[in-house]
A protein has these predicted regions:
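Non-catalytic surface loops within mature trypsin-like serine protease
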Residues: 41, 112-114, 224
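Single conserved hydrophobic/aromatic residue that forms the stacking wall/gate
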Residues: 219-226
Length: 226
């Protein structure tokens, strides 16, 4: 069993992402599994080394330790997406050569079947079903050869051997796309778990309008066990 978190160093660690990290860490530890931390920094314009350092420091402040990934290493080379662009391009071109994707104004789009269903069992929500007629062809490699989130995340989860993907339910609508990519790469599907979002007192998704929601702010005001 292997779980992961994949924060993007485009800002400080959000409390919602910290909750997701804690869930993955606890589930891995409770089941003698492996917990991996990778850095999703394909957004090279907004990603900074300062934010990456801040995220790592705050994960450690939360008491989390990881078995594989950034800083601790492992058997899969780099754990930063910005150093794996060649790998993503290789996969995109393979899908293109197999007529599972096509070029569109310099970009590469994944070809979604016209009909059918994508079904999977979610650890929290139970059986999920998506009609492919509601899913449009989607970009996997941009015209500048940078990967989209869908491609980079799926390739990494395959290459690193992730068996359970636990993340926020705001990503739920992307899961059918990821399942199609896993199948296109002839990969075994991981299990999925979509965690409920955190909400503020006004019943809306927790965001900066509710005040500072970064862990960096929290650890200045609360002890770790809080």
């Amino acid at each position: 069993m292997k779980l992961r978190i994949a924060p993007s160093p485009t800002g400080q660690l959000h409390i919602g992402n910290a909750r997701t990290a804690l869930f993955n860490w606890l589930y891995a530890k409770a089941n003698n599994g492996t917990f991996l931390v990778r850095i999703d920094d394909t957004d090279t314009e907004r990603s900074t080394s300062e934010y990456q350092k801040d995220i790592i420091e705050n994960l450690k402040w939360l008491g989390l330790n990881w078995d594989e990934g950034i800083e601790v290493g492992g058997s899969h080379g780099s754990y930063k997406q910005s150093s794996r662009f060649d790998r993503y391009q290789e996969v995109a071109e393979n899908l293109l050569s197999r007529n599972l994707a096509y070029e569109d104004d310099g970009a590469i789009r994944f070809k979604v079947p016209n009909d059918g269903l994508i079904e999977f069992e979610d650890y929290i929500r139970g059986k999920m079903s998506f009609n492919l007629s509601d899913v449009e062809d989607f970009v996997i490699l941009r015209s500048d050869k940078s990967p989209t989130y869908h491609l980079a995340s799926t390739v990494d989860d395959l290459d690193y051997g992730i068996t359970i993907i636990a993340r926020g339910e705001d990503i739920l609508s992307s899961t059918p796309k990821h399942i199609m990519l896993f199948k296109a790469m002839d990969a075994n599907l991981p299990d999925f778990c979509h965690l409920p979002l955190l909400f503020g007192p006004d019943g809306k998704k927790l965001s900066k309008r509710h005040g500072d929601t970064s862990v960096s702010y929290t650890h200045l005001t609360l002890p770790t066990k809080a």
